[in-house]
Swiss-Prot record:
This is Guanine nucleotide-binding protein G(I)/G(S)/G(O) subunit gamma-7. InterPro entries: G-protein_gamma-like_dom (IPR015898), GGL_sf (IPR036284), Gprotein-gamma (IPR001770). It comes from Mus musculus. GO terms for cellular component: heterotrimeric G-protein complex; synapse. The modification Cysteine methyl ester is found at residue 65. Belongs to the G protein gamma family. Disruption phenotype: Mice display increased startle response but normal prepulse inhibition of the startle response. No effect on survival to weaning, fertility and mortality. Keywords: Acetylation, Cell membrane, Lipoprotein, Membrane, Methylation, Prenylation, Transducer.
Length: 68
């Protein structure tokens, strides 16, 4: 039982390694510079960086709490 189980696991591992070997790779320095460029180009549209105008914020309370 364990022999056939080990063979099946080894086949799955080999298949996964073949898939990963076929993936195109780029250097980290290239990927990081591309990512930084993308972030800089899209920063003005990012609501986490520039904020959401109060008039467009659906989560802002429309009225203050009456209890307080």
């Amino acid at each position: 039982m364990s022999g056939t189980n080990n063979v099946a696991q080894a086949r799955k591992l080999v298949e996964q390694l073949r898939i990963e070997a076929g993936i195109e790779r780029i250097k980290v320095s290239k990927a990081s510079s591309d990512l930084m460029g993308y972030c800089e180009q899209h920063a003005r549209n990012d609501p986490l960086l520039v904020g959401v105008p109060a008039s467009e914020n659906p989560f802002k309370d429309k009225k203050p709490c009456i209890i307080l």
